[in-house]
Amino acid sequence: MNFLSKQEQMIKKSINELGYNVDEVLLIPSSRKEFGDYQYNGVMSIAKQMHKNPREIALDIIEKLKDNKDLVNVNVQGPGFINLSFSEEALVNYLNEVKDNININYEYDNKKTIFLDYGGANVAKTLHVGHLRSANIGEALKRLAEALGNKTISDVHLGDWGRPLGLVILEFSKRQPDLCYFDDNYTGVYPDKSTVTNEDLMEIYPTASIKAKEDENYLEEARIVTKKLQEGHKGYNELWKQIIKVSSEDIKKTYTKLNTTFDLWEGESDCYKSIPEMLEYINTLNITKKSEGAVVIDVKKEDDEIEYPPFMLIKSNGGASYQTTDLAAIFQRVKKYNPDEIWYVADNRQALHFETVFRAAKLTKIAPDVELVFAGFGTMNGSDGKPFKTRDGGVMSLNNLIDLVKVESEKKLLPNIIEDRDEVAQCVAISAIKYADLIPFRTTDYVFDLVKFSDLNGKTGPYLLYSTIRMKSLLANAKKENIKYNNVEMIDDNTKEIVLNLLNINKVLIKSFNTKSLNEITDLLYKITNSYNNFYSQVRILTEKNEKIRSSWLAITDIVYQNNVKLLDILGINVPERM
């Protein structure tokens, strides 16, 4: 159990021994440091239940807490707010435990198996800035879950089976009608070598999409091609496989730049295979009805504050809907992986869609015991407050965004970084992009400021990297000069704030896990780093004459460095050797 949790349990035990039965004690950082480092505000609730004066109860409690040697300066303020600080001995013991085992800060009892669906890449299309937040938030949530000891399974869930693929195949058939894929009578072996390049796809899909909007006949042809593809047309399926392979390789390269990985590279096509079995099961439940030629499930509830449309199981043309594909994904995932929870990381605007799917999953008992979570996010906007665009108003590709930030980041690197300058600039750029993307609460929109987010000063990824690298360099220099350090032996005014920030790691991680938002981790990481830098600027660690003080300072530096690296890793940010 981590330090704060232990203290809360001990205080709870003391309070209950006085006859005040409380279920939990929560210590929060005090807003008035002159009274103490932490505050307990639960006395008012106890007083209400016991019909007693809250200040009298608070005085009873602090008298009892005098027996706890880990606490100092226990006092009551106002009507019954208990303030306290931890003894230097208790904090020193905590630091030495963490130094020997950093995982103390990353404990979590209620471990689960969690399936995460994020990324949302579409085959035959380039990844653009609209895909950034799903990748960053999803990857960080996965790493957070793993850091707390949960088992995770992640899936990119490619958009690889709908009309966009029909459009691409149709346009190929218009341009190269003699290819064997379009000959219904072809009986030979299809080519091993792909006839499709990613450059082809980047041009073909936009062209086909425009044609479909302008020409109803072209759109109808695309519908027919899509239907034939989904019904198993051999030639179309062979070409489709090539499109998937080529496009997926390009998508993987971009995700790799973002330090984003997936256990599964499955897509809508994989879920499509489960639809017949799922429909057969649903048909036994007698919960569907016909509506204008379609088969639907009513998912409305009496206490709904908004109008929920019915879940469309089968469209009026006999095809499976997009909702059905997502329900089939849940059906397949529950059956194959038996997760405790499934998290979907997608744009806020998909909230109604997913809530409808989740309700259908519960009504059909496809996922009766699985918690289905929609982790919606806001948009990344430009300086005009509208979704981020290129200068000419187009949608910016993710690669272009990364390159822009990389150019800005490269300007900040030391001139003596020559050999791996490009690699380091890339690492710094990704830190700028990811940290900025994770600072706001998940559901909040934010404005992307290229210059601000690339700055080496302030609340930025590059600032955190630079500071963490400096810690590592300090420890390396101590080793070079044969300056040894072991345990923390003392905490002074210079290091107290650092320690108090470190104490909050476990609580912040668990809260972030529960809210599915990384903003409090980004905030705590900045506080830890900033408090360390304030300390660093006030002392001369390696030239300190007092060995006890110097050893403690170096040990604390080591602890902060270890936690910074781990917290940055949770956010999906790598620390380069230098910058």
Where do the model's predicted regions map?
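Non-catalytic interaction-recognition regions
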Residues: 1-92, 108-579
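Secondary-structure boundary elements
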Residues: 90-105
